Amino acid sequence: MSLASLEQTVQTLQALPRDAQITNLITLAGGLSKLAPDSTQHWDVRDVRQDLECADTVGLYVRRDPDGVRLAAEVGQEVTTLTKALTALMVQHLDGETPTAIASVTANQLSKIVPESLLRQRQNTVNYAVQRLQDAVGKLEPVGV
């Protein structure tokens, strides 16, 4: 997909009533398993760890491809639904993008899909999800090295 498709999805989700936003976040979280890394493929970056900000392990997988950056993710069972949903949304929409495009995504953009009452409690989750993906992509070797 693309950065434009991410922004379009964010706008669509933002326009929904609170209950529909929550339902969509749960659906996104449930789809994360389909974005798991394929063990038969090479990954330039395997960033798998449990940070203090997170209840369980988050694994982000990145590789450079002629068509852009390929992304995959897997998380432990204790990871919050919101972290799963945001990770799935970014991996799904940013797969194939350039490192520069991925670096341009802001937590503020993704915050728009989180109901305001939930966002007050979970802003750090949004920041964490965006930063982890950008850090993993940032570990790619520059082209030509």
Which residues fall in each region the model found?
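Extended low-complexity intrinsically disordered regions
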Residues: 1-48
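Generic structural signal for hydrophobic core residues of well-folded globular domains
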Residues: 29, 93-94, 133, 137
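Structured beta-strand/loop patches that form or line metal/cofactor-binding pockets in enzymes
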Residues: 40-62
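Conserved interaction-surface patches within small, structured recognition/assembly domains
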Residues: 63-80, 94-95
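Short Cys/His-based metal-binding microdomains
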Residues: 81-85
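Alpha-helical support elements that line or immediately flank enzyme active sites
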Residues: 86-100
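C-terminal binding/interaction regions
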Residues: 100, 105, 109-145
